Amino acid sequence: MLPLLVVLMSVGSSEAENPLQMANVLPNASFEKRSQGGVEGWSSRSWNGDSDGIWTVAAAGRTGARSVSIASKKGLDAAWTATVRVKPKTFYELSGWIKTDKLQGAIGALVNIQNMPKVRTPSVTGTKDWTRVATLFQTGATTELEINCLFGGWGRSTGRAWYDDVVLVEVAGPREQAMTRATATVIIDVDSPSVEYNPMIFGGFIEHLGKQIYGGFFDPGSPLADEKGFRLDVIEAIKELKTHVIRWPGGCFVDSYHWQKGVGKDRQPYDDDRWGVVEPNTFGTHEFIELCRRVGAEPYICQNGLADTQEMADWVAYCNSTTGKFAEMRKMNGHPEPFDVKFWSVGNERSGRTYIHKVRDGAKAMRQVDPSILVTCSGSHGPQAHIDPYLLETAGKYLSLLSIHEYWVANYQRHQTPDYLSCMMLSEKPDAHIRGIVKAFDQANMQGQIKIAFDEWNLRSWHHPGFSGHNARKVDHKDPEIIALIKARDKSLQPSLYTMADALFCASFFNTCLRSAEDVEMANIACLVNQTGPLYAHPNGIVKRTHFHTMAMYANLLQKRVAKLELKAGSLRHGNQSVGVVDAIATVDETGEKWSIAMVNRHPSDAVACTTKMGETLLDGTYKATILSGHSPDAYNDIEHPDRVVPKEVELIFNNGIVELPPHSLLMIQLQDRS
């Protein structure tokens, strides 16, 4: 029988997705049709425990008007049960949505099959909002199934659980070879020249949106902040990431930002017409430079793409000049020495001929002030890796970098919570995206002359319903609808969103950048703090999300050069999509003696036997390694449990070249540290 592929996904009930629009085998799956004493097609039953069970048809459902629930104060095994006919030797997915209140003891709440006891979804316990659970299975010879919305385990579960939108659908089964255990082979080329990569791929991005800046790392008045308003705990955590470059102030925010209003003592709050909030304007150029200096990052400033080129040139003069009007202004504001900002962008996520001319003229104007700066502009944002040839033809000779943006789960208007496997199916998309950009450079005969700055990237975008960011919108800040839209942005802060899917997608993204080291100069995770970032700052402290640890491992444990390797791996499939089950990268120091290898096993539940060779030699022996994994692919860190997912140092045994890669894990292996 196929090993069960389990999926756990949590969302708020107001953002729940519709049930699968397929042929649902189950009757009355949303429990909308009542029958005498219950719901049509389902019956209540109990097994072990006290007889205090309460089966209820609840007046509110995840979707529709109803759901069903089970409750017990003393302990119970109980279910709502439906019996259905199915095809033999056929793959099905069983899923449902569960909400719980103080559910504890034994297993909890889940959906299972009574006459196929090994087929069961993950369980939900505690107090949780609507949570999707699912499992994939094959029926074998069975033609009839008893489906349980199950509560309990050994008669000891207490609390209450609600069930809704239970779905049993036939799905395409994996190919025959996927039925066998996945394997992989990594052959590291020890003879070909290695390539030095730019550590600026470990960069960050911050924007005046949500709680990234205010209420994030900059929070004057917080007991955790210093006299200048910087949260010291957040600053120390950012240092762990070895963040080499930080991009600011936007993002779409920059299209209404005028830098002179954010320097000096007389700073006035103003309406940010991009994000519909009042910008306090207390974090400006000087504060940004101080942030960068504190964490050891290069500052990267994105200019207002709607401003005139003189305003752009003046900002460069303010930051970098030693003499003149703007140098004197900077000195009057407390900084006699220039900031020496090296990286400047002309606008954010803009396109068209008017913009391209602005890029050309803005780059020329800025470089007249400081010829040493490196200029970038908006090249591609969104899933299509398309670069306007006119941009490269008109402004290419003034550019050192080209800004690329992509978020592979677009949460802008609709908050989505795809499951682990769906996220893994996206993990090879960055590689295809970068290849498309490089092809555009090649067609313009500019490969090697302009490098890629992937200066906004993340698996998930942040949530900002009602505001596109690209269009100005005047709002009434007292309007209840506007208040609700602004509040909805906090959905991006939910700890349960950031699972091993985020950690391993992040690893795959870095592997892509490392493989493309000759073309990718910079990458900035969006964002660095709060929203979808690796670091969650709350009023009482911080939580290092799963992808924080991925970033820290890559920034601290790799060597400085990328070696070639050949990777052969089986496929991990989900529906009609597939990716390699293993991803890997090898790095080496300048001497060729120290090696660090990163290996990712994307499989949610199975270990992978990986054969590793250094040239023609099978790797053998015990080596020190660092592993990042969790108790399940859906493991996450939160305020109550900040260390569910943390890196651990282990000793890894290679037996005749073969090493076991644990499921849903990242391994960083130090070959020089042989035990």
Label each residue range with its predicted role:
Residues 1-10:
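Bacterial N-terminal signal peptides
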Residues 175-418, 431, 435:
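N-terminal catalytic cores of secreted or lumenal carbohydrate-active enzymes
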Residues 15-187, 191, 262-280, 298, ...:
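Extracellular and organelle-lumenal recognition/adhesion modules and their flexible linkers in secreted
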Residues 354-510, 568-578:
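Noncatalytic carbohydrate-binding groove/subsite architecture in carbohydrate-active enzymes
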Residues 615-639:
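Solvent-exposed beta-hairpin/edge-strand motifs
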